């Protein structure tokens, strides 16, 4: 809030609970960029409160959550958009145009690979959450567990209570691009390996 105030002169109201924000502010549009395990509940609540929703990928923690999100926005008559930045990046769009032009010839198979840092890490001891952080609210619909700095800030994607790992984080982008290009609704086969010892 202080940074926004320094840049604009306006100081936004702060809320610790999204439900209070929805009730008091009655926003027309909500942007959800919270950890993945909150996406479904917050999207459904925002749609039911009368807001259009832009939600970062992945939509939900499970297929059932994602379906519930779609149903809630349909029932409310509001629009939901999922944040997939590779749909709008100029090099991705031009690459898609090239692939669809037929200039690459007949494509018989598509494979995607995602590689990244991984492997064993030294465990960090649990600790108290940072001052001012409501750890119970952060955990929300996930099982309450002790705070650990491997989870927050930024590491939540490696913990399945909060996200779906690398496949749910980066795999969403790669799978979406192939489905976008091929105009298929679903992959025919998915095989994934990985993990931490």
List the model feature ranges, each with a label.
Residues 52-54, 59-137:
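A contiguous active-site-proximal alpha/beta segment in oxidoreductase catalytic domains
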Residues 136-197:
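Rossmann-like dinucleotide-binding domain that binds NAD(P)(H)
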Residues 27-30, 104-107, 187:
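Local beta-strand N-terminus motif with an aromatic residue
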Residues 40, 44, 67, 89-93, ...:
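A structural signal for well-ordered alpha-helical segments within the folded catalytic domains
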Residues 1-55, 61-79:
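N-terminal glycine-/serine-/threonine-rich beta1-alpha1-beta2 phosphate-ribose binding loop
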Residues 1-9, 86-89, 99, 178:
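N-terminal Rossmann-like dinucleotide-binding module
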């Amino acid at each position: 809030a202080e940074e926004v105030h320094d840049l604009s002169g306006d100081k936004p109201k702060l809320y610790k609970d999204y439900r209070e924000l929805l009730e008091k502010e009655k926003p027309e549009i909500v942007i959800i960029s919270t950890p993945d395990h909150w996406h479904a509940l917050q999207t459904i609540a925002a749609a039911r409160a009368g807001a259009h929703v832009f939600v970062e990928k992945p939509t939900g923690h499970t297929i059932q959550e994602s379906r519930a999100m779609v149903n809630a926005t349909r029932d409310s008559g509001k629009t939901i958009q999922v944040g997939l930045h590779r749909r709008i990046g100029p090099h991705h769009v031009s690459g898609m145009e090239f692939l669809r032009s037929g200039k690459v010839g007949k494509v018989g198979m598509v494979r995607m690979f995602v590689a990244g840092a991984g492997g064993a890490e030294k465990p960090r001891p649990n600790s108290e959450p940072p001052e001012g952080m409501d750890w119970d609210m952060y955990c929300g619909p996930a099982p309450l567990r002790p705070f650990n700095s491997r989870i927050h800030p930024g590491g939540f994607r490696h913990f399945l209570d909060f996200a779906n790992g690398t496949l749910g984080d980066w795999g969403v982008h790669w799978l979406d691009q192939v489905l976008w290009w091929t105009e298929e609704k679903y992959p025919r086969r998915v095989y994934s390996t990985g993990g931490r010892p």
